[in-house]
Each structure stands twice: as structure tokens, then as C-alpha cells.
């Protein structure tokens, strides 16, 4: 018997965030980063380690990239949030995932694409095209991994995410799991987005990237910025009183040529 986690789902919604825009603006916030907005699987027991169903309320376990996550609200509420934020001079940055789907969705995604002869095109990686331990060609946490080296798969993923941006005038995308997808896929994604909005920006999550290592993703027509993982160490040193170490680290970062790109200063507004 499967028990339901109590509570089984955490998180706010579009309407609640809309109500807090003035509060956030008073704090000096000019860009709001929100979770992936697409429909997610309702529960997961893939590891068989518990009889309690767990929920991907974080948004990273997509079940359908064409539908909105019902827990976040309806499309009218999402549009209202964007319109209200824009009216206050604020931007909305939506988290997106192109690397993987939610647990148990292999059959669904493998049924979507066909070639010119009517043969099925598998969107999800199997043992025939997996390289164990490889960042790009193996699954992350056993999640169904998209075969993004296949152009047909990339084109479909890019189309889904571009349609969301175009329909709702989303300002920016925060891109998940950058290191697990080919640079050619990110280039195709950026090209598609900038055809709709030439000023559209993407900030990537590349685990381990920092001021001294941009992983080759900056200045290549893909990511406009990367999350600065080095800052985690700076912050820990600061709160533990190691101020001299923080000063030295910040000085090195300030002197680095790509410093303004690595930690996303381009998203600051005048």
C-alpha cells in the first residue's frame, strides 16, 4: 500500500507571488526566478526505498512540456503575474529543463516523434546510446535522459520551450543542467529564442562553474551568464569569520576578464 506524504506537496503559486510583487519591489528585487512551470509527475517511487510517495514540487520532473503545472495555477494567472511584474518594471525568469523528463515518462516521450517513413524516434536514451558515467550520455539520478544529440529530439524540446516564451513574453530563462547537454543544443535553443525576442537572455546552471571556469559556455552564442558556484565558498567563509579569504577571493573575481558574465551582472537593471 502506498502512503501519501504529509504534506505531499510544497510550494506557492502564481497568484500568491503576484500578491507579493510590491513587497519584493520594495526590497529592491528587479528579477524573479521561478520554478519550471510545466506539468510534473504527481509522485515518484522509482528508488523503492520508501513506501511514501514523494512529489517533485521543485518542477524538475516534467511529465508534459505542453501543459502548465496545475499546482502553480492556470494560464490566466501566469499571464496576470507577468503583466503585473512588467507593469512594475520587474522581470520574470523561468527555470527550464532540456536534459531530462520525470520518472516513468519514457513511454510517453518515446511515442511523440516519427521519421519520414513513420518509424518511431526515441526521445529517451536507452542502453544502446548510453555511456556510463558520462555527463552528457548517461542519465542524471536515473531520470529519463533526452537524446539531445539527435536533432529531431532537440528541435522538439526547443519548440516546446520557445512556445512558452513567445506566448507569455517571458523575460529570461534559467537553464538547468547545462553540463549534461551538448553546446550545439544550447546554440539551437538560443537561436530559436532570439528569433522571437532578440534581447532574450539565458543564465545557465553549470555545476562547478565560477569566475575562473566558464566551461566554454560563455561568448559562444549559448549562455549569456552562468551561476557562480564559487560564491557559495565565499559566503561560507564570510559567515564563519574568514574575512581575509573572502577579500582575496572577491579581488580575484573582480580582476577576472569574464567576471561580469559569470555571475550574471548583465541581469541587473539601471
Segments and roles (model prediction):
Residues 86, 90, 159-267:
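Active-site-proximal helices and loops of the catalytic beta/alpha 8
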Residues 1-168, 188-197, 201, 212-213, ...:
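Substrate-binding/active-site clefts of carbohydrate-active enzymes
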Amino acid at each position: 500500500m502506498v502512503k501519501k506524504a504529509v504534506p505531499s506537496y510544497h510550494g506557492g503559486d502564481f497568484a500568491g507571488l503576484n500578491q507579493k510583487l510590491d513587497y519584493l519591489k520594495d526590497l529592491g528585487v528587479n528579477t524573479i526566478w521561478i520554478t519550471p512551470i510545466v506539468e510534473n509527475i504527481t509522485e515518484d517511487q522509482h528508488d523503492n526505498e520508501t513506501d511514501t510517495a514523494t512529489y517533485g514540487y521543485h518542477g524538475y520532473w516534467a511529465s508534459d512540456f505542453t501543459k502548465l503545472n496545475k499546482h502553480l495555477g492556470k494560464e490566466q494567472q501566469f499571464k496576470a503575474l507577468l503583466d503585473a511584474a512588467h507593469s512594475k518594471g520587474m522581470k520574470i525568469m523561468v527555470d527550464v529543463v532540456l536534459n531530462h523528463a520525470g520518472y516513468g515518462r519514457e513511454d510517453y516521450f518515446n511515442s511523440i516523434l516519427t521519421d519520414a517513413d513513420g518509424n518511431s524516434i526515441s526521445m529517451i536514451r536507452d542502453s544502446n546510446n548510453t555511456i556510463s558515467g558520462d555527463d552528457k550520455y548517461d542519465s542524471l539520478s536515473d531520470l529519463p535522459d533526452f537524446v539531445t544529440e539527435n536533432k529531431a529530439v532537440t528541435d522538439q524540446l526547443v519548440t516546446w520551450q520557445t512556445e512558452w516564451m513567445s506566448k507569455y513574453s517571458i523575460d529570461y530563462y534559467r537553464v538547468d543542467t547545462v553540463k549534461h547537454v551538448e553546446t550545439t543544443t544550447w546554440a539551437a535553443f538560443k537561436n530559436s529564442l532570439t528569433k522571437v525576442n532578440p534581447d532574450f537572455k539565458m543564465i545557465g546552471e553549470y555545476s562547478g562553474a565560477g569566475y575562473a571556469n566558464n566551461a566554454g559556455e560563455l561568448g559562444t552564442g549559448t549562455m549569456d551568464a552562468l551561476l557562480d558556484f564559487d560564491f557559495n565558498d565565499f559566503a561560507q567563509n564570510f559567515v564563519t569569520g574568514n574575512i581575509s579569504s573572502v577579500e582575496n577571493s572577491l579581488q580575484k573575481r573582480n580582476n577576472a576578464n569574464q567576471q561580469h558574465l559569470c555571475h550574471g551582472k548583465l541581469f541587473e537593471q539601471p
